[in-house]
A protein has these predicted regions:
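Hydrophobic/aromatic pocket-lining and membrane-interface residues
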Residues: 1, 20
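Rossmann-fold dehydrogenase core element
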Residues: 2-10
């Protein structure tokens, strides 16, 4: 039919992919070189799962049970980098304390997709970020015991436990009241450059529909 499929052009992964690019452009302007380490930190996300999203994640988990070898692909941040393998990446599968931001951070459930796309973009731009580039994404939970407890809870919880059925999803009011806020921190020469990417409306619906339309 001549149709073209544009992958990863919604909330996953445009705000993250372009957020890193915007940050690196700023870092290069100021320091003459890119940051070798960037931390993506989700500071806020107000939205709901849809039944279709939940079904897709469920199908992914079912496929992993049938083909355990796919776990290696899912866990490899360079799986979309056409054979290129960079340095070991920061761990993002359990809660950690981000000392530079003074907050506990938890694993972000879409990081396995976003990190792969960020590294692929780096490859497609002839390693504009450098071949030693490191990147991870985590979810900010706050400082102190409360932050640690929240991070531990998210790390051990199942996001699909009370997911809606396919065809179900958030109301129009809920979609319009959603939002997100992602911080990107580029570490370079013992300094850190911060930029933020913010969006209105539910990340997976209102924001994603706008990004998909613009990508098309």
């Amino acid at each position: 039919s001549g149709s073209r499929i544009v992958f990863s052009c919604g909330f996953d992964s445009i705000p993250f992919d372009l957020g890193v690019l915007f940050l690196q452009n700023e870092v290069v302007k100021r320091f003459g070189k890119p940051a070798s380490n960037v931390r993506g930190r989700v500071r806020g996300m107000n939205g709901e799962f849809s039944g279709g999203t939940a079904a897709s994640l469920g199908a992914t988990m079912a496929a992993l049970k049938e083909k355990p070898e796919l776990f290696a692909v899912l866990a490899n941040p360079f799986a979309l980098s056409n054979g290129f393998t960079g340095p070991d990446q920061p761990a993002d599968i359990k809660p950690v304390f981000d000392e530079k931001l003074d907050t506990w951070v938890a694993p972000f459930f879409m990081a396995p997709i976003n990190t792969k796309n960020v590294h692929r973009s780096n490859l497609l731009m002839n390693h504009f970020y450098g071949e030693d580039f490191c990147y991870n994404e985590m979810w900010v939970q706050g400082s102190g015991d409360a932050g640690k407890a929240a991070a531990d809870f998210i790390s051990s919880s199942n996001p699909l436990s009370d997911a809606p059925k396919p065809g179900e999803g958030p109301s129009r009011e809920s979609r319009e009241n959603g939002n997100y806020d992602v911080l990107f921190c580029g570490d370079i020469d013992e300094q850190s450059v911060h930029v933020s990417v913010k969006g209105d409306m539910d990340p997976g619906y209102g924001s994603t529909s706008k990004m998909i339309s613009e990508s098309a």
